[in-house]
Amino acid sequence: MLEVLDMAPPRHQPAAGKAGGGRGHGHGHGHGGGGGGPAARKQPLQSSMAQPKAETAAATAAVAPPEGGKKCGGGGGRRRGGRGRGGRAGAGPGPGLAAAPAVVVAPAARAVIGPPVASKGLSFCRRPGFGTVGARCVVKANHFLAELPDKDLTQYDVKITPEVSSRSVNRAIMSELVRLYHDSDLGGRLPAYDGRKNLYTAGTLPFDAREFVVRLTDDDDGTGVPPREREYRVAIKFAARADLHHLRQFIAGRQADAPQEALQVLDIVLRELANRRYVSIGRSFYSPDIRKPQRLGDGLQSWCGFYQSIRPTQMGLSLNIDMSSTAFIEPLPVIEFVAQILGKDVISRPLSDANRIKIKKALRGVKVEVTHRGNVRRKYRISGLTTQPTHELIFPIDDQMNMKSVVEYFKEMYGFTIQHPHLPCLQVGNQKKANYLPMEACKIVEGQRYTKRLNEKQITSLLKVTCRRPREQEMDILQTVQQNGYEQDPYAKEFGINISEKLTSVEARVLPAPWLKYHDTGKEKECLPQVGQWNMVNKKVINGCKVNHWACINFSRSVQETTARGFCQELAQMCQISGMEFNSEPVIPIYSARPDQVEKALKHVYNMSLNKLKGKELELLLAILPDNNGSLYGDIKRICETDLGLISQCCLTKHVFKISKQYLANVSLKINVKMGGRNTVLLDAISWRIPLVSDIPTIIFGADVTHPETGEDSSPSIAAVVASQDWPEVTKYAGLVCAQAHRQELIQDLYKTWHDPQRGTVTGGMIRELLISFRKATGQKPLRIIFYRDGVSEGQFYQVLLYELDAIRKACASLEPNYQPPVTFVVVQKRHHTRLFANNHKDRSSTDKSGNILPGTVVDSKICHPSEFDFYLCSHAGIQGTSRPAHYHVLWDENNFTADEMQTLTNNLCYTYARCTRSVSVVPPAYYAHLAAFRARFYMEPEMSENQTTSKSSTGTNGTSVKPLPAVKEKVKRVMFYC
């Protein structure tokens, strides 16, 4: 086993500024002055990771803030067994942890009897109380209170014969059944149906089991077969009573598991009417009538819609309504659609092979209706495009194989003269018996969602449509609720569900911005951000890097050497002004190269520089890129980071021609952290005043998994983990990446073992490597772990926590027996639909410039989970559109954070993001993990997307092999190369 953890740690020196004292600036936030003060915290820590549990518990308790907002579930105080797996708070240690003696607390501490353990055997962290820090205010949330019905709900099994795969057809069958039998056999009941095998009623039906016969005329299925009447047998059989008692218990916090069945019933009931009115996609509904569709280009248009979901919250059941938009195929005549795709007049000349293939891809699977038969609007699904133009197409008209041309057939049969015989025909219906339809005789059917990848222009257009100011967004949501008319909804009435038409008013708090520390040689040594923003004027980075040896390569034909040289000099000067030691001259003259020669050019510049430096390293490469550079950016990053071991900074041509001080300042910040410097640190960090970070060596992780885009069936998913490499500053983050099975959400390489012929069983993985790296960087071993995990949906919480917490434990134990630092595991979510609005949009003191709620606004009541530890935090100032708060859910907490401590730490970290002088919307470690995962996509060789395997491939949980990514060079992965 690799021994890296047995030397006594040197006493740690903070980055800069006054370690220890430091001005308080009115901070403290109810944390008892930091719990023990700087002096107590700077004692040398025990060197062994096998530190006795009792001592750790005692040490942690010694620096705990005063009694008051501590953990419930056994009496408060900080204990290592705070939230063990399989029990409530205080119910004992988690796996791999020896039991620690409980800390004795005063009788005044609250004692709460926890609810029963979750049936899964693992309970998520209970809410420790509510936060109190910050200026109190009221915000409005797009949650609408739903009153629970007091009726019994009954579930019935449905079996339709012959079996139908289409939900819409199933719904049509059930609608016809209800129409025929509502007043008779169904006893006046109006059931809600999920479109599959479940039917729900308020109360019971007059029977336990019955079979019905329903006749339905087929809707056009696009195959071209004439519609006919079909007979279906529908068997309805009693299945179970859906008990709402457990849902009430869960909302009251007296039950651990959310009763999914009861929630599902209510969700289906409230979606029943919308399913009939709108196009349903996932949890959203779309219609061209909600707002006028906007053209996105290339034959697409945006449809406005709304998201709807029923959720259990502290205030009771809540209906979450949000606006959404997505791309639909514009219902154009096919000729017009083709003209938009090709961006030119297609009527006048034949299609080239390349254009024909492009059109075939765009039209395959699309439903069209014919326009040459008057009122007969038969529908067909396009299966392909003919290779020949229409005037060359012939087909047999009888068994004797007498042939007729398509042009003649349409003239004789329908009196339709084909105007553009040089264009190919659409092939529709069955491939074996192809039917030909002239493009000009077809129109695209309305309401077809576009599922392929959008191009950049379309994405920009769609974002413009969805970008609505908070006031407009709020009005749209309220209007949607009124249009949906839940009061008049016959299904809601039937089941006794009442929906409020008012946004929920929620008590919130605005957390104060943290003081930031800059270098003492700058005019401004400390800075207090205003409304989530500040700037670098009169400030110098707290730890400036040294760049002695750099080179520049110019891939832009339009940038002359003198222009490039002037830009590089300006950038070097800005780096110096910002506090870096930056050589004004490159190692070799600026080298111009063609983008298609990227690898050759990079290696040439690298080798030329090494020859000139006589054994010294080239430290930084600047690259000037054309504005539209295709794969060039990714190629540069891949070659520099996985082949040459070189840090690079790319700059676009438009910025070289139009040099702005703001741009140069931002680039200099990126260069500084890429080269190992620090831009700023929290004043509280270097003053040893951050609860549950400053008291003992603490490592903060961020993790994310990014998946390939829709349509990429075999590309691997990319997992990234970053971890802080400095303490107490927690500002520098090293990052590791790995490829794993397609759409695999669990991070496979957190901890791994493999057999080596020489060394036997070898242990490794990203957590282990980053723990070792922290020790090397700080001389300390982490005695506490805080893990921010991005990209996990609610349905995956349990699985992700179980797998990844276990991997963290194993990684720690592999370094030293009994090494189990306490872990806090927090899921970060941005893809939710909760929006927060100012209570009064006219009150400028309660909004930022964009009309959004103020940065630092936190909500942990009313719309949050009934009993678990979660909160919404809007940590950033809005720029355009409506801000989306991040949702943080603490799934596991052995460090016993109070609500204030977790919320304040998370908010303060959002001011340490290295790439800009703004607070960001997601906690930086999670943000960095996302950047690192995104960067790693560039490392994949083109053939990796073809799912090729190699002898060194790693195997995902579903058994598929994934080719590993090329390794990032050692000196690159030590720094924030992904910024």
From Swiss-Prot:
Residues 77-86 have a biased composition (Basic residues). Probably involved in the RNA silencing pathway. May bind to short RNAs such as microRNAs (miRNAs) or short interfering RNAs (siRNAs), and represses the translation of mRNAs which are complementary to them. Plays a role in the maintenance of the indeterminate state of the stem cells in the shoot apical meristem (SAM). Regulates leaf formation through vascular development and may be involved in determining the central domain of the leaf founder region. GO terms for molecular function: RNA binding; RNA endonuclease activity. Residues 54-67 have a biased composition (Low complexity). One of its GO terms (biological process) is regulatory ncRNA-mediated gene silencing. SUPFAM superfamilies: PAZ domain (SSF101690), Ribonuclease H-like (SSF53098). This is Protein argonaute PNH1. Disruption phenotype: Malformed leaves with an altered vascular arrangement and abnormal internal structure. Aberrant SAM with reduced OSH1 gene expression. The gene is PHN1. Keywords: Cytoplasm, Developmental protein, RNA-mediated gene silencing.
